[in-house]
């Protein structure tokens, strides 16, 4: 049945990234029903996704329903089946929580730690990546940042809100430097830690701020494929829990 996914997607006027997301959901569906569309198999599939967030279930069922209708139109199945999202209650504790970190935009006595936090929160950068950013890699006119890590290059959009924050740091060779040399990771860790303590957010870390970036992107409707590209990930495996 997987051979019908491509013809189904080809008839849809959607982006390549959307096609990848559709294909991923449909391949999972076909594997779960073992290539046989029956009421029992459909119930088994629906049970297999019941622990996902309601929004994720809705997206998956929408893709499956469209695919089922396509199969029915092409007379590949005898009757049209439609899956309906059940009413489920998900406890707050089970959900990843979006934090209100608007205070990060206020002035700080640890300005460099503050900028590091904002670059992680708004762009998903790793501290090690931030410390290696050269001034030449930052283009405020086009609002893009070039990152090179382990031979992999990527270009990331700089949010409008960060352009003015970066301006004061574009004077040397590196974004953060001393005598033309980039600071150590330990220095970066201390700067970030000092800022988070100042903000009363000592329990947060670079990793949790990066998670907040992912949650914010998902809240905006950004797909995991695009997020993985921005983060420089080779696969989406580590992002599965955000589906």
From Swiss-Prot:
Question: Core-binding (CB) domain spans which residues?
Answer: 1-72
SUPFAM superfamilies per the record?
DNA breaking-rejoining enzymes
Q: Which GO terms describe its biological process?
A: DNA transposition
The reply on keyword DNA-binding is yes
Keywords, in A-Z order: Cytoplasm, DNA integration, DNA recombination, DNA-binding
Q: Where in the cell is it found?
A: Cytoplasm
> GO cellular-component terms in the record?
cytoplasm
Q: Which Pfam families match?
A: Phage_int_SAM_1, Phage_integrase
- List GO molecular-function terms, semicolon-separated: DNA binding; tyrosine-based site-specific recombinase activity
List of catalytic residues: 149, 210, 242 (o-(3'-phospho-dna)-tyrosine intermediate)
Q: Which domain of life is it from?
A: Bacteria
Q: Which InterPro entries match?
A: CB, DNA_brk_join_enz, Integrase-like_cat_sf, Integrase_catalytic, Integrase_recombinase_N, Integrase_SAM-like_N, Tyrosine_recombinase_XerD-like
Tyr recombinase domain spans which residues?
85-243
Q: Does the keyword DNA-binding apply?
A: yes
Function, as annotated: Putative tyrosine recombinase. Not involved in the cutting and rejoining of the recombining DNA molecules on dif(SL) site.
Q: Which HAMAP family match?
A: Recomb_XerD_like
Q: Which NCBIfam families match?
A: PRK02436.1
Q: Which family does it belong to?
A: Belongs to the 'phage' integrase family. XerD-like subfamily.
Instruction: Specify the protein name.
Output: Tyrosine recombinase XerD-like
Which species is this UniProt entry from?
Answer: Streptococcus sanguinis (strain SK36)
């Amino acid at each position: 049945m997987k051979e019908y996914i491509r013809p189904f997607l080809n008839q849809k006027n959607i982006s390549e990234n959307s096609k990848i997301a559709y294909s991923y959901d449909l391949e999972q569906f076909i594997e779960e029903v073992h290539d046989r569309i029956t009421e029992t198999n459909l119930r088994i599939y629906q049970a297999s996704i019941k622990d996902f967030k309601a929004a994720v279930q809705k997206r998956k069922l929408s893709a499956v329903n469209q695919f089922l209708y396509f199969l029915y139109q092409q007379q590949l199945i005898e009757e049209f089946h439609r899956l309906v999202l059940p009413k489920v209650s998900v406890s707050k504790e089970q959900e990843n929580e979006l934090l209100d970190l608007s205070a990060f935009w206020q002035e700080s006595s640890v300005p460099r730690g503050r900028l590091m936090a904002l670059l992680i929160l708004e762009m998903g950068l790793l501290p090690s990546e931030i410390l290696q950013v050269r001034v030449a890699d930052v283009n405020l006119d086009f609002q893009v940042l070039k990152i090179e890590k382990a031979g992999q290059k990527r270009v990331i959009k700089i949010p409008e809100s960060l352009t003015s924050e970066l301006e004061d740091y574009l004077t040397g060779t590196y974004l953060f430097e001393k005598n033309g040399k980039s600071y150590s990771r330990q220095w970066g860790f201390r700067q970030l830690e000092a800022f988070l303590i100042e903000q009363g957010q000592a329990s947060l870390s670079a990793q949790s701020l990066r998670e907040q970036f992912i949650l914010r992107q998902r809240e905006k409707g950004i797909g995991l494929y695009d997020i993985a590209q921005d983060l420089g990930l080779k696969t989406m495996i580590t992002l599965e829990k955000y589906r």
